[in-house]
């Protein structure tokens, strides 16, 4: 039976750009004028400039003492055909002190027809003739992928992974409980989620992953999604050369050793100088640099110090042949002067793609950070290393950099990051200054001479390095401000048309039985204005976008997993978020995720916060759709919270602690400990603290393996009873307007 992916046939509207190619061929009789020619023979070069496009200025090399230069150099401009695009041509003479303009000319690109190619002469000073060859064509193959569907690589992964999971589930559940697994259509999609929470989340998630690996649950999962601190563990695990052949146990031993050191040891003058100088190369190439870059280097040096050149793209090798779950990471795009709780676009990262589902725009990971215009790369840079992305994914800590390093004057050492961030909005994080202009380090006119250019760059570098060093290691105003510490990247959606918005669940006939009523949607979980502006579009005119830690809106990466294209049946989430005390209700982040899902018309089981009053604090809670016959697309959620309950009595599930030492090692609080060993701001974990938190979550996970297995069995049966779970009947789809005409001619369609 062949399956059709209906999301593949949804039209994500975008306007095609034009590629304008200019070949600077040659010039004859270049002159500086009668008197100027008597003093010096011209050293000509040509500058091309179109103000309406990024990467707008191009230039040829120069020739010494040549009045009839032949360049034969080709340049490309990506243009918006709706703009009045004018090419400015400037003939220049290179000098040591100040370059001299010999003449200028203009050419209206609108005078060219698409598909046309011609040579055009330009006359300067009534003597010099320059010949340019110009051509104009449509960019029919943009570098962005415009689609609501998953990319082909992920679809291939899912097919392979289902084959593997089918056998793994039979082994996990035994022949009786897995008898419903007749084909891959019966295989449920299981996703594992890890929250933010700094090193507390990272260490806790390391224990979780060890338990899931050893129990066989990880072999039955399709996705592992992380946010902030959990992404740091995922990065450590997936970048390790021995994973997945080697399990988390040995890798966690390495991690424990790495986080036992004080992070201030990474801020020796020699190391900081090396960090900053390496970033100068990035800045001088035209890429934005913020404190997030430096924080990413510190995180990388701590966790993946021998793998600093690893990239996100390189992790594709780990999921080849679907040997392990596909890792998904996330951050937020935010706007200046708008609280991230009011507006934030979720950006998803996988080894295959980076993009925003809200706009149906995706790119390969090696293009993230490159300069785009209308969906086409106009300037490509090297792929950002994984440690830079780790800094972006956990950038809340670069915002409060001084607290992380322990040099803050604050006496409230027990306060959580969440408490400190309550009064921070995007306007404190995002610098809304003139840096939106292109950042290429450009010398003044006259630096064409290589020695002068080198001297100019060295002076600039020395000044910049000095400022950054002073900001890091002194109590300067720059060090104590939060402004400008968000990650900053070139806007990959610059120049696109966002007149049409796309719901995150475009094919779903959202019925009133499983939706929120108005009172529920109006009820605030954390803030009266939460999610108030989530339907607003991104600013496609801004040259830069700011990306921050997703935990600044809510601390669980549900938006990645709730995309209906992924068809997740069972979500196992682990919440390491800070709470006021160990006995506080643990559902704040889950309730925010629920509200976000309902506002985006995505199925989500009803979260009953009063279960805490009825049943008290537990290691995990199960939330199911109340009416499975109606809520056919609604996943089941097993929600683990950070709690030390049974671990105090048992050293393994069913095995009591007996000795005094065994009891003492497990007798600890997480949020009520006055020493705050598990504070969100703690970036040094002595071996005992690491083992306590790691072993606690290892135990909690293993102690509830039967809960997970039972949910998997129910998901298999649910799949069998609802074979059309991922199918779409066009007659029931409200979003028919999004389909192309060819697809609408089909009577029905089913997805994979």
From Swiss-Prot:
Keywords linked to the UniProt accession: Calcium, Cytoplasm, Fatty acid biosynthesis, Fatty acid metabolism, Glycerol metabolism, Golgi apparatus, Hydrolase, Isopeptide bond, Leukotriene biosynthesis, Lipid biosynthesis, Lipid degradation, Lipid metabolism, Lipid-binding, Membrane, Metal-binding, Nucleus, Phospholipid degradation, Phospholipid metabolism, Phosphoprotein, Prostaglandin biosynthesis, Prostaglandin metabolism, Ubl conjugation
* Domain called C2: residue spans: 6-122
- Tissue occurrence: In brain tissue, expressed in low levels in olfactory mitral and granule cells, in hippocampal pyramidal cells and in dentate and cerebellar granule cells.
Q: Does the keyword Isomerase apply?
A: no
The annotated pathway is: Lipid metabolism; arachidonate metabolism; Membrane lipid metabolism; glycerophospholipid metabolism; Lipid metabolism; prostaglandin biosynthesis; Lipid metabolism; leukotriene B4 biosynthesis
Covalent link Glycyl lysine isopeptide (Lys-Gly) (interchain with G-Cter in SUMO2), residues: 541, 606
Q: Where is this region: Disordered?
A: 427-457
Documented activity regulation = Activated by cytosolic calcium, which is necessary for binding to membrane lipids. Activated by phosphorylation in response to mitogenic stimuli.
List modified residues, type Phosphothreonine.
268
Q: Which GO terms describe its biological process?
A: arachidonate metabolic process; arachidonate secretion; cellular response to antibiotic; cellular response to homocysteine; decidualization; establishment of localization in cell; glycerol metabolic process; glycerophospholipid catabolic process
Q: What is known of its domains?
A: The N-terminal C2 domain associates with lipid membranes upon calcium binding. It modulates enzyme activity by presenting the active site to its substrate in response to elevations of cytosolic calcium. In the presence of phosphoinositides, regulates phospholipase A2 and lysophospholipase activities in a calcium-independent way.
Q: What is this protein called?
A: Cytosolic phospholipase A2
């Amino acid at each position: 039976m062949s399956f059709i992916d209906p999301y593949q046939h949804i039209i994500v509207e975008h306007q095609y750009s034009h590629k304008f190619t200019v070949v600077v061929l040659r010039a004859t009789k270049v002159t500086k004028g009668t008197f100027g020619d008597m003093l010096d023979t011209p050293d000509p070069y040509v500058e091309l400039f179109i103000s309406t496009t990024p990467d707008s200025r191009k230039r040829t090399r120069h020739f010494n003492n040549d009045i009839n230069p032949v360049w034969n150099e080709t340049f490309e401009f990506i243009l918006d055909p709706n703009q009045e695009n004018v090419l400015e041509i400037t003939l220049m003479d290179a000098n040591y002190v100040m370059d001299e303009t010999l003449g200028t000319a203009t050419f209206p690109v609108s005078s060219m027809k698409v598909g046309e190619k011609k040579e055009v002469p330009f006359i300067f000073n009534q003597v010099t003739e320059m010949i340019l060859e110009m051509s104009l064509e449509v960019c029919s193959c943009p570098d962005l992928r415009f689609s609501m569907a998953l990319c082909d690589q992920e679809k291939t992964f899912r097919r392979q992974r289902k084959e593997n999971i089918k056998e793994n589930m039979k082994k996990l559940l035994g022949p009786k409980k897995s008898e419903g697994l007749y084909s891959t259509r019966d295989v449920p999609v299981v996703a594992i989620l890890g929250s933010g929470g700094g090193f507390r989340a990272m260490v806790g998630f390391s224990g979780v992953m060890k338990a899931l690996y050893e129990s066989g649950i990880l072999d039955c999962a399709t996705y592992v999604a992380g946010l902030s601190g959990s992404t740091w563990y995922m990065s450590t695990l997936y970048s390790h050369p021995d994973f997945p052949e080697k399990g988390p146990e040995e890798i966690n031993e390495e991690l424990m050793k790495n986080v036992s050191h004080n992070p201030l040891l990474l801020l020796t003058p020699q190391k900081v100088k090396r960090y900053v100088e390496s970033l100068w190369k990035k800045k001088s190439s035209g890429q934005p640099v913020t404190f997030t870059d430096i924080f990413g280097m510190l995180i990388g040096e701590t966790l993946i110090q021998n793998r600093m050149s690893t990239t996100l793209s390189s992790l594709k090798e780990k999921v080849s042949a679907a040997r392990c779950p596909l890792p998904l990471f996330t951050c937020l795009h935010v706007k200046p002067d708008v609280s991230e709780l009011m507006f934030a676009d979720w950006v998803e990262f996988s080894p295959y793609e980076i993009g925003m589902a809200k706009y149906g725009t995706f790119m390969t990971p090696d293009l993230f950070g490159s300069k785009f215009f209308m969906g086409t790369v106009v300037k490509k840079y090297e792929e950002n290393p994984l440690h830079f992305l780790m800094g972006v994914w956990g950038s809340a800590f670069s915002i409060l950099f001084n607290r992380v390093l322990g040099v803050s004057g604050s006496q409230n050492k027990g306060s959580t990051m969440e408490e400190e961030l309550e009064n921070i909005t995007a306007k404190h994080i995002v610098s809304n200054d003139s840096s939106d202009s292109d950042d290429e380090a450009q010398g003044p006119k006259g630096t064409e001479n290589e020695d002068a250019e080198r001297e100019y760059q060295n002076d600039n570098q020395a000044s910049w390095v000095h400022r950054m060093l002073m900001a890091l290691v002194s109590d300067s105003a720059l060090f104590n401000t939060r402004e400008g510490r968000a990650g900053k990247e070139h806007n990959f959606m610059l120049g696109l048309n966002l007149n049409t918005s796309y719901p995150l669940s475009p094919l779903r006939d959202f019925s009133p039985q499983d939706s929120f009523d108005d009172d529920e949607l109006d009820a605030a979980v954390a803030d009266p204005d939460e999610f108030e502006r989530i339907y607003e579009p991104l600013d496609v005119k801004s040259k830069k976008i700011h990306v921050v830690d997703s935990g600044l809106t809510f601390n669980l990466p549900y938006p990645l997993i709730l995309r209906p294209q992924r068809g997740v049946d069972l979500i196992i989430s682990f919440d390491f978020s800070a709470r006021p005390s160990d006995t506080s209700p643990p559902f704040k982040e889950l309730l925010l995720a629920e509200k976000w899902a309902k506002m985006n018309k995505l199925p989500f089981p009803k979260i009953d916060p009063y279960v805490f009053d009825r049943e008290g604090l537990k290691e995990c809670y199960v939330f199911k759709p109340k009416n499975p016959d109606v809520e056919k697309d609604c996943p089941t959620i097993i929600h683990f919270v950070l709690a030390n309950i049974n671990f105090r009595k048992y050293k393994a599930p069913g095995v009591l602690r007996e000795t005094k030492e065994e009891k003492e090692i497990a007798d600890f609080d997480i949020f009520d400990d006055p020493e705050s060993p598990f504070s969100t701001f703690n970036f040094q974990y002595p071996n005992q603290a690491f083992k306590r938190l790691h072993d606690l979550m290892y135990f909690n996970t293993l102690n509830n393996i039967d809960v997970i297995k039972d949910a998997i069995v129910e998901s298999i049966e649910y799949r069998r009873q609802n074979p059309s779970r991922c199918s779409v009947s066009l007659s029931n789809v409200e979003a028919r307007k999004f389909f192309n005409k060819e697809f609408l001619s089909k009577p029905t369609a089913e997805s994979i």
